[in-house]
Amino acid sequence: MPRSTGFIQRMLYLGLWLAPCALAQAPAPAPPPAPQSGPVLEARARHEAVDDDAFANDAEADTLRVRLGYRWIFTPGWTLYATAEGIGNLGSGRYNSTANGNTAYPVIADPPGTEWDEAWLGWNGNPKFEAKLGRQKVILDNARFFGNVGWRQNQQTFDAAMLAWKPAAPWALRYLYLDQANRVFGNYNPNPLLAAYELDAHLVNGSWTQPWGQVVAYGYFVDNQDLPLTSTRSLGVRLTAKHALSPAWTLGVAAEYADQAPYADGADINDASYVLVEPWAAWRGHTIKAGYEVLGGDGRYGFATPFATLHIFNGWADKFLTTPATGLRDAYLGASGPIAAGWNYGLWWHDFEADDGGASYGQELDASLGRGFAKHWSVLFKYADYQADDFARDTQKVWIQLEYVL
């Protein structure tokens, strides 16, 4: 359940109290190029339509998200950042927002509401250290374990403390303590478990970067105090590498392995592994990827990443936001790149099956077309077509989106 804003306030007060102490006692480092203070303004209008054969009714939502705030660089190295956001329904409301009670319609998880988005105090006055306290986005690596779910109108944030250390050029270490997850369904959702999770989580992520790529090792220890049986620890390693064959051609690969086990009061069955292999080739701005991702499962428990930016994995139709107990194998092929007049395309094909038992979980085709224009504007057309076999029901989704970012 959501905690009060007391954590954010305590962290901000503590940071403001420590600021003059740090400025007085620390030797003055060479000042890095400072970002500018200024307003934050974003607006995104979206039409989303869902045809899910599990429902007699199709869903349609026309929503507008406005995010407004300010970044204040109040002394070299110190930043205060705060944004609030409002989400409004511009259409008929014929969809299940998760908060409006329209359960006869498919879910489009953009409930109307107004809330604080981010509110944090940051320090980066030393090129080797960075700290941040308060409500903030958390995006680790490719967002497979922790992300901001930026696709939804209300992004996911965390009440957290972050410390980053770069002891030498190729090395970086980041630690985060997470106190609360503020979910995409809104802080005032009538279901408190959709609004937020109280956490006692420790995240450690270390990287070694070279011209040819990067190696990352991580340990994520998450005690979900609202759903204690789901608590897990995940230990893993991720490799990304690339090699230029010529000025036009580049080959690359991403590979990852993680082991998940129960943590704190987590259930004994929370035991599974994760594997990813994703080779790719790039030519003059166009990229082709062929991937194989396995979220292990044994019929009782499937490898879980509940705080990930899940929409960008396993198909845009969002049929696998929760990993089945039998796990999931996703073999996919995709291409993306520029076309005429500034437009960019994306095409993806997925074939899904159970990790335990091998049942066919269907196929999915995803396509997108988008472009930016007039410096601050972008438009996006997007489509997902999931064809079911032994899991879920056939589902088609369409999005039309216009966005402004100052």
Language model features with spans:
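Aromatic/pi-system hotspot detector in well-structured domains
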Residues: 44-48, 120, 175, 202, ...
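Beta-barrel outer-membrane channel/assembly domains of diderm bacteria
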Residues: 24-138, 161-167, 238-253, 258-262, ...
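C-terminal outer-membrane beta-barrel translocator/porin domains of Gram-negative envelope proteins
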Residues: 83, 89-91, 106-107, 263-274, ...
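Surface-exposed coil loops of outer-membrane beta-barrel proteins
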Residues: 93-118, 126-228, 233-237, 300-334, ...
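Cleavable N-terminal export/targeting peptides
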Residues: 1-33
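Long, internal scaffold/assembly segments composed of regular secondary structure
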Residues: 210, 221-295
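Solvent-exposed loop/turn segments connecting transmembrane beta-strands
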Residues: 154-155, 196-198, 225-231, 261-269, ...
